[in-house]
Structure formats: C-alpha cells, structure tokens
Regions:
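Glycine-centered tight beta-turn/hairpin loop motif at sheet-sheet or coil-to-beta transitions
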Residues: 12, 106-108, 132
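Conserved catalytic network of the ASCE P-loop NTPase/AAA+ motor domain
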Residues: 40-41, 93-95, 105-108, 281-284, ...
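Extended helical coiled-coil dimerization/tether regions that scaffold
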Residues: 8, 199-265, 385-394
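C-terminal lobe/lid and adjacent interdomain/linker elements of RecA-like ASCE P-loop ATPase modules
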Residues: 1-4, 245-247, 305-394
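Electropositive, glycine-dotted interaction segments
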Residues: 110-238
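Pre-Walker A-like glycine/lysine-rich segment at the N-terminus of P-loop NTPase domains
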Residues: 1-65
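Conserved P-loop NTP-binding catalytic core
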Residues: 34-41, 45-47, 51, 60-113, ...
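Conserved ABC ATPase signature
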Residues: 45-49, 237-281, 289-302
Length: 394
C-alpha cells in the first residue's frame, strides 16, 4: 500500500510535489478505507484533475519511472549509460538533480525509500523501515559513500559492485540481500500501471488463456459492461495473438446464432475496457497500486465509474489494492463516489511554468458541496481559462 509519493525536478515539476493517500478525518464513505496497521487509514483511490498541459500526468510518470529505475528497464544500465532524467526546463540551473521518494507498506512494515540522480549517476539513495513501529535506517548512500545498519561488511561488498548509474536497492536484490529484499519486492510486485492511451492486453489475455474461473471473471465483467460480447477466443501464436469476440443474434423462432468478430472491429471504448479489466482484476487480487493516466480514455462514463467503484468497494477490494489516476471527467467529482480527500488537482503557474499539486481538502469544501460545478467555475483552480472566462458553468 502506498502512503505518499513525492517528486522534485521532473518535467514540469520543479519544486517538490507530493500526493498523499493518508485518509483525513472525513467520515464520509469510511467503509472504503484500507488499513495497513492498527493506527493508519489510507484511501484506496486518488483522482488527479487538471487542464491539458498542467502536468498532472507527470506525477504519475514520475512514480512509474521510479519503478522502472528500481526493477524495470533502467535497473540494469551498463557502465556509462545515461539515466532517464528529464529535469525542469524553464530554469537557469538545468543541472539540478531529480529526486523521487515513496513511503509504502509491504508485509505489514512501513518503508521510506528515495533517491536523487542526474543524467550520469545516482547522487543519493536511502531506505528506512519501521519494523517495530520505530524508524530505523537500512542504508543510506551519498555518491560512493554508504552507511548500513546490519551486515555491514557484506553490504559494503555489494555496494562496491554497484555502478554509479545504478540503484543499490536494485543491485543488492540481484545478490539476494535480505536487508533490502522486501523493500524491493513492493516495486516489483505491488506497483504497476500505464500512461496515456496505451493498451496493455497481457493481463487480460493471460486470464483468458488460463480458462476456468480466471476467464469467467473477465467474461462476467464484459457482460456486466453490456458490450454485447458473450465469449472471447484467442488463436494464433502467443507473440501475435488473434483475438475474437462472440456476438449472438436471436431469431424469431427463439434460436440464436453466434458470430465471431475480430477485436479490432469493436469500438475503441470496448477495446479499452477489454485491455484494462485484466489489469484491474489482477491488481485487486494482488493488492497492487494501479497507476492509470487518462482513466476515461474512449470509455463510456459509466464504465469508468464502474472501474473506480470496484476499488472503492471493500467487499470487492479485499486485498487493499489502490488506484491512482488522472482524468478530465467531471462526472467523477461526485461525493457519493469519492471522498473529499481523494480528489487532487494539478495547476501550472503560467509565469514560472511550474506544476503545483494540491488537494481539494485545502479548500475545506462543505459536505454535500457540488464539487463538479465548483471545479468548472474555477473555484479550485486547475482548469483552462478559455478566452479568460471560466464562468460558463453556472
């Protein structure tokens, strides 16, 4: 479970931006809250709103990039290869480092992990945990200097094998370091997502190929979404699967006839729902953090709402999955769907070109307030001022 993520100097984000999934004292929709321990309550869903080019997607991009640097394509860079730094461009100090930090729970233990880097090397890196409710250092790094709390000599050996453009959390995992294993596994097992209009079919296709209850869950959701699809068939090689959807026509004599259509002939919204439902079900089963840019992309608003309700529903989300998404859909600004502490905004300062991230709770909205109307009227910022006037939503 993710408690908080912060990012500094990444794309349009210059100063530190923070999103927090810690629940406020708001009593509404309290049944949806998830608890990593006896003292804390977290929200399962965080929605991020903002105008086009405001930088809301950059927050999600940073979180997923952090994962890629820990356990993805940037985790095993060769010596001399560049790190994927994309610093804030509108500045006289373009060489400033980028930094990420995630505070999360894995196996009932709280972790705080972060690092800073430039295009050539990791500058700082640290990991803390709270195994008995008290903060304790696991390791810290500044340049080539390391500090360790346990198994110092063994970890110094591993540190000596860690290139300057690699994270110690990544390299130590390759050598099965028990001190960093669980902190690493959160990124590897519990954090996933996609950006923009990307279609990720892997999870859905895997469930269908497994058959049985896994396929039944996919078909149940397709039927629930009223897409007219009765079955899914996959043929051809695994590398280039041919996906077909079964539709039926009822004749006047009471019989029905089935027709298989290529998935590519379905609407874009249907294809989008098909690609996402597998990831949704997998995240719910694993208790993962699912990061989704433009959640409503090409889908009917009711389908988008259904996907959010699945994570909000404690009876469905029994493994404490979380969903972080960006959207323009003001229909989701509904306090019967989301709590006030689940709604966040991104706004770009037109003078500095910096993105600011802030929560709806900073405005102390009243219970029952029409958040959608207030947002379109500019009450909370984070909207485009077309022609300089946003007062049309009266």
């Amino acid at each position: 479970m993710l408690l908080q993520f912060s990012v500094t100097n990444h794309r349009s984000i210059k100063d530190t931006a923070i999103i927090s999934l810690k629940a406020s004292t708001d009593k509404s929709l309290s049944d949806c809250l998830i608890s990593p321990d006896e003292k804390k309550q977290l929200v399962p869903v965080l929605a991020l709103y903002g105008a086009n080019a405001a930088g809301k997607s950059n927050v999600l991009h940073a979180l997923l990039l952090m994962r890629e640097m820990v356990c993805g394509r940037y985790a095993k860079l060769l010596k001399g290869e560049s790190l994927p730094q994309e610093p804030f461009a509108f500045t006289d100090q373009p060489t400033q480092p980028t930094s990420f930090e995630a505070i999360y729970f894995y196996g009932g233990i709280k972790y705080a992990y972060g690092f800073s880097f430039d295009k050539s090397k990791v500058l700082t890196e640290y990991l803390y945990h709270w195994p008995n409710g008290r903060e304790a250092l696991v390791f810290s790094r500044e340049g080539n200097g390391y500090q360790f709390r346990e198994n110092v000599q063994e970890q110094l050996t591993l540190a000596g094998r860690t290139a300057e453009n690699r994270l110690y959390l990544s390299s130590s995992n390759e050598w099965n370091c028990p001190q960093t294993e669980k902190a690493y596994l959160w990124f590897f097992e519990k954090l996933t997502g996609f950006m923009g209009t990307e279609m990720r079919l892997d999870a859905t296709l895997s469930a269908i190929r497994q058959g049985g209850s896994e396929k039944s869950r996919i078909l149940h959701e397709m039927l629930y979404a009223d897409l007219g699809i009765k079955d899914i068939r996959i043929t051809g090689p695994k590398e280039e699967p041919i996906i077909s959807a079964l539709h039926t026509l009822d004749a006047e004599d009471g019989t029905s006839k089935g027709f298989w259509l290529p998935l590519g002939q379905e609407s874009v919204g249907t294809q989008r729902f098909f690609s996402r439902i597998g990831m949704w079900l997998a995240a719910l089963e694993a208790g993962s953090v699912l990061v989704v840019d433009e959640i409503e992309s090409s889908m009917h608003p009711l389908l988008t709402r259904h996907l959010i309700e699945m994570v909000q529903d404690a009876a469905i989300n029994t493994n404490h999955a979380q969903l972080i998404f960006t959207t323009h859909d003001t229909g989701l600004l509904d306090l019967t769907l989301l709590r006030r502490d689940q709604i966040w905004f991104a706004e770009k300062n037109e003078k500095t070109m910096q993105t600011d991230i802030y929560a709806l709770t900073e405005f102390s909205p009243r219970k029952g307030e029409n958040i959608s109307k207030g947002y379109l009227q500019g009450r909370y910022g984070a909207i485009p001022f077309i022609g300089g006037d946003a007062a049309w939503a009266e």
